[in-house]
Amino acid sequence: MADPVLTAGQYSIGHDGSSSAYVYGGSSVATAAGGILITNTAVDPGSINVQDQAVVGHDGMLFGIDTQPGMIVTQTGQTYTPGLPSVALDCYSALAGAWNDPTIRLADGAVQVLRACYAGSAVTRRTYGRGRKIMPTYGSVNQGVIPFVAQFQSADNTWYEDTLSSLTLTSVPSFAGSLTPPLTPPFQLAASTNYQQSTIVNTGSLPTWPVITFTGPVSYPVLAYVNTPVSVGYTGSLKATDVLVIDTRPWARTAMLNGTTSVAGYLNGSAMISMQVQPNSTVAHFGGTDYTGQSTCVVSWRNATLSIGGTY
């Protein structure tokens, strides 16, 4: 399934990758989806958590690490179905139901995706989190108008490109041919595999989080960023049918084998928080042991920015 396509001024909220995500808003009354008009979208980055310390015995301040809690996206809007109060109530109910979806709200760690094709933007962008308060005012419902304010708590302070980027790295056996008698011991057999490296390109203005997928057969697979100390690997073997997904995104931070078994305790190398892909180019190298040449490592990411829209 794929997310619904948005036109100018439209938004959607729902499960990641779901074609049934709720679409609302538009750049005009004629194009407003769901009978909803959004008049304003405001972003509050939240209060920065600081680790500053006073200089002992003198004026001044020693700065520590500043962290951000995740932005709050506040939308002000209204249902707009003139002369149709019952329809207005239905439109608000549909939006509020999607905003406070219990399949997300009551599931530990689950997130929604808020997508925006902001008026004036050439692209659709997204943020991950949960719909929180949505507050209607019913005084003008008889006119088919229900003003509301809705808040969305993001997992971080980032808008991500809607289009997913990916890079596939493969392995190539380092030996070829066969053994032909007569043979004289000791036999010299290849014990390694040549692996591919290529470039991850993050065209956004911020670092972004990769999702790393290893597919067997391979033993001790590892993904490393060349000319850096950063790498992540698995201390085990994957069969040809095995798929290991390492999701470094802050709202996930999981390592799942075949979608059901957590193997986070079997990872080695750098912590997931160190795996961010920096803006511009990062050379990635896939390593491990595979004598078939069939294993792969797929790195997927979304370019990251601070703006709800833009040209790319």
What are these regions (language model features)?
Residues 162-312:
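Intrinsically disordered, low-complexity segments enriched in serine, threonine, and glycine
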Residues 108-161:
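Short beta-strand and beta-hairpin "edge-sheet" elements
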